Amino acid sequence: MSFCSFFGGEVFQNHFEPGVYVCAKCGYELFSSRSKYAHSSPWPAFTETIHADSVAKRPEHNRSEALKVSCGKCGNGLGHEFLNDGPKPGQSRFUIFSSSLKFVPKGKETSASQGH
């Protein structure tokens, strides 16, 4: 079940190349392609962030199983974390808007794409 409006254009939903997904606004590293997996929702899904501070989380009103997530560096809105809804028991599912991400292919990482 999803809590976001879907407007289409989710270019990273079926994107599985090796690399890093960074914040579209500031370039901070958010998710590795290793944590991305196929899910039935229309948004890209990840099981974990790259760094403990990659995202900031706040409760979603009236939905104890969902947290709103934003970039841990600049505050750019990213989507949601759904607790215990990942591919394995106990894992989360990060449901992220493609428009909030930029993809950096493996081997093309720079200090700018890492948010430094």
Swiss-Prot record:
GO terms for molecular function: actin binding; L-methionine-(R)-S-oxide reductase activity; peptide-methionine (R)-S-oxide reductase activity; zinc ion binding. It is an enzyme of class 1 (oxidoreductase). Keywords: Cytoplasm, Cytoskeleton, Immunity, Innate immunity, Metal-binding, Nucleus, Oxidoreductase, Selenocysteine, Ubl conjugation, Zinc. The keyword Cell cycle does not apply. Its EC number is 1.8.4.12, 1.8.4.14. The active site is at residue 95. GO terms for biological process: actin filament polymerization; innate immune response; protein repair. This is Methionine-R-sulfoxide reductase B1. Truncated MSRB1/SEPX1 proteins produced by failed UGA/Sec decoding are ubiquitinated by some Cul2-RING E3 ubiquitin-protein ligase complexes (containing either PRAME, PRAMF6, PRAMF9 or FEM1C as substrate-recognition component). Belongs to the MsrB Met sulfoxide reductase family. Residues 1-106 form the MsrB domain. Its cofactor is Zn(2+). The keyword Ubl conjugation applies. Methionine-sulfoxide reductase that specifically reduces methionine (R)-sulfoxide back to methionine. While in many cases, methionine oxidation is the result of random oxidation following oxidative stress, methionine oxidation is also a post-translational modification that takes place on specific residue. Acts as a regulator of actin assembly by reducing methionine (R)-sulfoxide mediated by MICALs (MICAL1, MICAL2 or MICAL3) on actin, thereby promoting filament repolymerization. Plays a role in innate immunity by reducing oxidized actin, leading to actin repolymerization in macrophages. The gene is MSRB1. SUPFAM superfamilies: Mss4-like. Binds 1 zinc ion per subunit. Zn(2+) binds at residues 23, 26, 71, 74.
